[in-house]
């Protein structure tokens, strides 16, 4: 379905029409870094490729020594992989996501967002214990989720946790 297109399906018939004036496409940056499925095509490349490239660019600015690169699942996966590959570092799933909990950053209250993080993520202790970690996330909206994740990693035995954001602007 294209921008401004209406697709109508009735009586086993598919009709498409564009009742609105054609306007220049102005995508939201969050389509590239968060909302789009990794296999969505955006400007001729998959969202996965865009996100992985952001991780590579972030790695070019890195000045921190770490044992492992850990993504905030699932939104930070591709960027963390690009980051790790560019630096030749180990990519590890130091956080395990419960896929039955939805997106936490769009919840209406801080209390619900905090509870959502606790239900959504668990630290993978055997992977992170005594490790210096670079934690990669796609973006930073409020910072409350990142704060809770960092605490979770330290509580699970991480030696150091450094947070890097793939799309900070």
Locate predicted features.
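PRPP-associated nucleotide enzymes
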Residues: 1-169
């Amino acid at each position: 379905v294209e921008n401004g297109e209406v697709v109508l399906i009735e009586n086993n018939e598919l009709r498409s029409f564009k009742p609105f004036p054609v306007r220049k496409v102005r995508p939201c940056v969050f389509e590239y870094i968060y909302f789009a499925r990794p296999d969505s095509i955006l400007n001729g490349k998959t969202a996965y490729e865009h996100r992985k490239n952001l991780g590579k660019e972030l790695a070019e600015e890195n000045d921190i020594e770490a044992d492992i690169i850990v993504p905030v699942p699932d939104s930070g996966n591709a960027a963390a992989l690009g980051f790790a590959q560019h630096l030749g570092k180990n990519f590890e799933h130091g956080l395990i996501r419960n896929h039955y909990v939805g997106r936490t950053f769009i919840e209406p209250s801080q209390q619900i967002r905090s509870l959502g993080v606790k239900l959504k993520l668990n630290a993978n202790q055997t992977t992170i214990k005594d490790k210096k970690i670079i934690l990669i996330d796609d973006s930073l909206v409020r910072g409350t989720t990142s704060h809770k994740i960092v605490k979770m990693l330290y509580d699970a035995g991480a030696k150091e946790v450094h947070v890097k954001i793939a799309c900070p602007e």
